[in-house]
Amino acid sequence: MKKAVSVILTLSLFLLTACSLEPPQWAKPSNSGNKKEFTIGLSVSTLNNPFFVSLKKGIEKEAKKRGMKVIIVDAQNDSSKQTSDVEDLIQQGVDALLINPTDSSAISTAVESANAVGVPVVTIDRSAEQGKVETLVASDNVKGGEMAAAFIADKLGKGAKVAELEGVPGASATRERGSGFHNIADQKLQVVTKQSADFDRTKGLTVMENLLQGHPDIQAVFAHNDEMALGALEAINSSGKDILVIGFDGNKDALASIKDRKLSATVAQQPELIGKLATEAADDILHGKKVQKTISAPLKLETQK
């Protein structure tokens, strides 16, 4: 009997020892083969602009291709709403943020909130003045402004009288496009007036109506985006004047207007490509890869044929 008990005890000890040698559950290799599905939060300045609708489309297509989920919020050109939207995305636990700032200064608080919890930030089309941003994905806005001024000078000659319709005050795109434009215009053109129309078509129309009354001798208009350019063109057509108008973006309405020989030209961006590049950058960052501080998408001058 004692011998039987001894055998049983020996077997029990053997089994306990074998069990203790098995690695813990977290250390076992996974056989599921599943990869983490990353969620990115996208904050757009406004989806009332065809440019940003195309940009969103590029992000959604690339995210789907990479197995990523996208949560989209529309700031409706309200910087306070955008800050709140981004804070909400952080609370929802997104893995990365893609932000198209309404105002480059105002968005800084939200960027810093993301930094505090380790959520990487990629800005699109416009930069953030403060906070850590992994990369800015945008066209070369300064170069685009220079292209617009050179086009006007080439068409109308030195000293042509030009009006400038500026974008949202505080937006980096407004500042950079204006800076590039004046790099050339201050030497070759006469900028007789400039005023903000907030990247908005209706405001572009209203502002242009007022500018035409105060400056009836305007020969050309450079608008910081196509929406303002198309609004300005409507005001010009109503006045019966023949004025060269160039926009910036290359959206569908602008390209159609150029084809119809109404809008003179646009500095065309590639919003879908910008969205694609931004999503690629976010995915690379989430997988521990390094990205460039600035990722540029090429520009093209679209003119009447």
Curated annotation (Swiss-Prot):
Keywords: Cell membrane, Lipoprotein, Membrane, Palmitate, Signal, Sugar transport, Transport. GO terms for biological process: transmembrane transport. It comes from the Bacteria. The keyword Coiled coil does not apply. One of its GO terms (cellular component) is outer membrane-bounded periplasmic space. GO terms for molecular function: monosaccharide binding. Residues 1-18 form the signal peptide. It is found in: Cell membrane; Membrane raft. A lipid is attached at C19 (N-palmitoyl cysteine). It holds the Pfam family Peripla_BP_4. It is a lipid-anchor. A lipid is attached at C19 (S-diacylglycerol cysteine). The complex is composed of an ATP-binding protein (RbsA), two transmembrane proteins (RbsC) and a solute-binding protein (RbsB). Interacts with FloT. Belongs to the bacterial solute-binding protein 2 family. Part of the ABC transporter complex RbsABC involved in ribose import. Binds ribose. This is Ribose import binding protein RbsB. The gene is rbsB.
